[in-house]
Amino acid sequence: MKSQLLSLAVAVSTISQGVVGQEPFGWPFKPMVTQDDLQNKIKLKDIMAGVEKLQSFSDAHPEKNRVFGGNGHKDTVEWIYNELKATGYYNVKKQEQVHLWSHAEAALSANGKDLKASAMSYSPPANKIMAELVVAKNNGCNATDYPENTQGKIVLIQRGVCSFGEKSSQAGDAKAIGAVVYNNVPGSLAGTLGGLDKRHVPTAGLSQEDGKNLASLVASGKVDVTMNVVSLFENRTTWNVIAETKGGDHNNVVMLGAHSDSVDAGPGINDNGSGSIGIMTVAKALTNFKLNNAVRFAWWTAEEFGLLGSTFYVDSLDDRELHKVKLYLNFDMIGSPNFANQIYDGDGSAYNMTGPAGSAEIEYLFEKFFDDQGLPHQPTAFTGRSDYSAFIKRNVPAGGLFTGAEVVKTPEQVKLFGGEAGVAYDKNYHGKGDTVANINKGAIFLNTRAIAYSVAEYARSLKGFPTRPKTGKRAVNPQYAKMPGGGCGHHTVFM
């Protein structure tokens, strides 16, 4: 007994002096993390308290949102930072950056009939321009897609294959004075041009139904369009929050993230307060355990304006530092009211878009989580249009979960997941109604447990996980530019 007490005293003394790496106080006496134990620490009351806190940050300011650089988002960043710092378990930092904020509104009419349009962020302004409408072939991604008489006209373009910014640029190169992009799936269309570009023309988004109707009208006669776009621009200082466990192997980092900002229209509690609080809840639960591999949590800023925060972070890492990140997990909208359990298609089997080596294994891990509980799931297109984009471009394996946005649920999906057919996964997507009341408690609880399941697995061991290649390409078939699922973090950001 005496020798055991002496050993204990030496261990405590050594830890208190900070000799054992960066490990937090009490680390040797914590149990090793397991999937079951970490999942059991996840409580719905903690999750809901978190999303209610984010709602309060939005409610506290006249803007009623948490858009990057605004007061609601500043409160969000400070709270996340302070909550993690207080655990003593993490090294926490705020990564400062400056990005251009843009807010735009559009009004559109065709042959005197008003249409419901959304201006693309970073669109050039348009002061009630009036012109004949022409239709681009294919998806408007190439110069040959534009009619010879495009000059001086407004051009109608179908969504898909290339980014909104590229479509706007191609329209500008063809001498169009405006562009209208319509959806290739049911529902309205909102998005961003990704930044300012002198090639861009005033650009608005339109629903699939309205876009098809306009194309039919052009085919049978002349259509005159009036377009008005009001755009505001402002440089804003903002921050990512990065928290890495003090313990664990820092040369084998398991990384996961969620964007912490909202759109201008509302508080963004599902998009993406759900993902932000999901990983926050897991981060707090993880403090009860020790682990073998370091875990790094990230809350990204300015995702809604073109993945700006995550791109800034990845660009700040040289190859040596990024190689320490063995995989990246992304969680964007995990509490949709009319949800479906969707897993990024890392192996490309559903959409012919593969992630870097290891992405398939991440997909299989999440499939196992649902399968073990007898729960249905489906793939969602792994297009690289969320905060994992910058990671896969540098060959970091990636994956994650998503419960749906503006795309409507089918009768077949209702048989799997319940809910209501013909209604969007999240009817309040990118709207003022995206509040705490918009959250499906069952979905957010289940998906947060899935986050815990994956973190525990990889924090314990990366044995058998594929070695990352030095170079790699993701196979992309343009026919799959039409994506089910939709939403922030999938295909509305750019395409």
Swiss-Prot record:
It is found in: Secreted. It is an enzyme of class 3 (hydrolase). Glycans are attached at N142, N235, N272, N352. Residues 1-21 form the signal peptide. Transmembrane segments: none annotated. Pfam families: PA, Peptidase_M28. Its EC number is 3.4.11.-. PANTHER family: METALLOPEPTIDASE M28 FAMILY MEMBER, PEPTIDE HYDROLASE. Extracellular aminopeptidase that releases a wide variety of amino acids from natural peptides and contributes to pathogenicity. This is Leucine aminopeptidase 2. It comes from Trichophyton equinum (Horse ringworm fungus). The lineage of its organism: Eukaryota, Fungi, Dikarya, Ascomycota, Pezizomycotina.
